[in-house]
Structure formats: C-alpha cells, structure tokens
Amino acid sequence: MKNYNSHKYEYGLLKSTKPSMGYDGSIPLDEWKSQAKSKLTELLGLPFDECESKAEIEYSKECDGYTEHRFSVQTEPGYYVPCHLRIPSGVCKPIPLTLCLSGHGGGMHIALGVAKNEKDEASLSAWHHRAMAPRSNKEGRAALVIEARNFGEASLTGYGTSCTEAAKIAILMGRTVIGERVWDAMRITVRPIRIAIFAASVQLVP
C-alpha cells in the first residue's frame, strides 16, 4: 500500500537515522565534547554579531524581602531584551545568582510569580516551580529573569507566544529561534562560577 502521509515518512527517516555525533568511546570524551559543542553552535546559527549592551535601568524598587531592578540590554544591534533582577534582602554579599528562563506561557512575569490574568493564576497554581525568582530569593540567591524571544513582551501581542512565525523567518536567514534565545542569555565575558540556570516550559491546556 502506498504511503501518502509525509509525516509518517519523515518519522520513518528519523527512526532510521544514525546520529552523526553520537559518542561511541572511540575518541577521548573531552575531544568529543569539543566537537559536539562546535556542531551544536553551527546548527543553532551562532554566533551572532556582538554589540554594545547599552544597558538601561528603567526602575528600581524596594519590595517585601527583595529589591527589584527592571532594565533592558541590547543583545543584537537594534534588539533589546527586557529583564528583571531581584536581590534578596538581608543577605551577605556577594551572593550567587540564578538565571531564570521561562518557557511557553504568558511571559517572564510567570517566572517572577506574577499573574496578569486567570490563565496565569491557573498556571502558577498547577506548576508552582514556574515561579523561579521567588524561590531563588528564598534560597538566598539573586534572580535574573529575562524575556525569551517571541514570549511575553517580546511576542507579537505583548503576551503569550508567537514562535511559529519567528521560527520560519529565522530558518530562511540561516538562524534559529532557540539560537537567538541562547544568544540573549549568554555573555562570553562572564565566568559562570556561582551562576545557576533554571528553565521551565509547560503549556497549560484548558
């Protein structure tokens, strides 16, 4: 019987494909890690052109148990990422930091533990771990929350997600949306000592 289902065909190709970068022990692990990192960087479409950060603080405010700084930083020429830095009160400095990356949902406000509507309230109620910043502060860590591309304030409407459109455009330019998000979250000049990363992605189905 002829197969007219293209998805079934592609799935068959996927199952029969042998990963080209699979580790088989024939070379030292560190050498394989270097090769894998180089290939992953290539597939993500990285690196992009570096630029001035032009960081600008929009506001700073004292809250119950922490100080919050809202700021933006330029990650590509003409593109700025909105961020929130929460520093817990009453801790000895310097302190460790958690980079909080929220996934599919309303936006980075979820990682801050802030609900903008009933859908957000349901999400935070069902998935407590998505409120990453409050947990980090409770553990004595600073929390840096950034808005991922095509999510929240960076989406078409300023709330929710708009990944599909952006992903198609990125592919046409030899880029990837995931590569763009990685680029926004990394800084080559920063040493990752005492910096943790926490990411959560879930789509709440009503």
Predicted features, each with a name:
Residues 86, 146, 204-206:
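Generic beta-strand/beta-sheet core signal
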Residues 78-81, 88-98, 104-107:
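Proline/glycine-enriched tight loop/beta-turn segments at coil->beta junctions
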Residues 1-67:
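N-terminal targeting or regulatory segments adjacent to alpha/beta-hydrolase or S9 domains
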